[in-house]
Amino acid sequence: MNIGFIGYGEAAFNISLGLGREGITGIRATDAMMNHEVMGKQVHARAEEAGVTLVSTNKEIAQWADIVFAAVPSSFTMDVCNDIKECLRPGQLYVDVSASTPATKENIWEAIKDTGVLFADAAMLGSLPKDKHQVPITASGNGAAKFHELMTPWGMKITLAGEKAGSASAIKLVRSIFMKGIAALMIDTMQAADAYGVSDEIVASIGKSLDGIPFQSHLDRLVTGTALHCTRRAAELKGSVAMQEEAGLNPEMTLASKHGHEALAKYDFAARYVDTKPTRWQEIIEAIRVEK
């Protein structure tokens, strides 16, 4: 089984390093920066450490490899596809691990589907330096099952998400809205807590509200409650914005939350649920989708 990487940055290096430790040999790679005066040194050092052979062009990888990993920045992944699509062949596996949008992954599939190649949209959901090739991957596309079949025996952790290219990337990017968003909220929250000398109290109070409760329960409670009480909570957030500004802090995330609450007012959920209350997040999201 010949494995090749187009792009040899952090993702390709860590995956190839892990696969090498599992016993896979003969991995090849290429990188647009491999001959760069400064960045090329890192590419060559990484390849040497992982026992990977560097080759000159993308096409060399595509013509040689049974599994082609496209591991370039998202802005270049379509260019790579267009560069190698004439070299792709039936039964070959093309795995794109870039953090591209679902639409880009769909466009890649449209560009290559007539070649007979198997395509896997592979979204990495963990720490590459820590997990190496065992980083959790969600994969979709007509080649996702083959990707799982070939690489799980070598320690890769692959979860399937259907045969539609773009589904795996959608999972990754939607998840990022929450994970990156809550991290930004944590920073803003603790800056404000620190400014007013109430850090310990805030941590204890929020912990009491959140600890030990399943995420699904939080989701149902917060989405339905916000829909019903968006106007009052937006007014409260106005005070939070003023407080942050008085402390010389940037209230950007709080302003975004305030605007999000205000945007719900047009649906008038409080009037809809006078006699009964919504209990599931789906009730709110479905109503917004239908009336948007």
Regions inferred by a protein language model and the residue ranges of each:
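Helical "substrate-binding/catalytic lid" subdomain
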Residues: I171-K277
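Rossmann-fold dinucleotide-binding core
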Residues: S100-K180
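Conserved beta-strand segments of alpha/beta enzyme cores
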Residues: G26, T53, L93, L118, ...
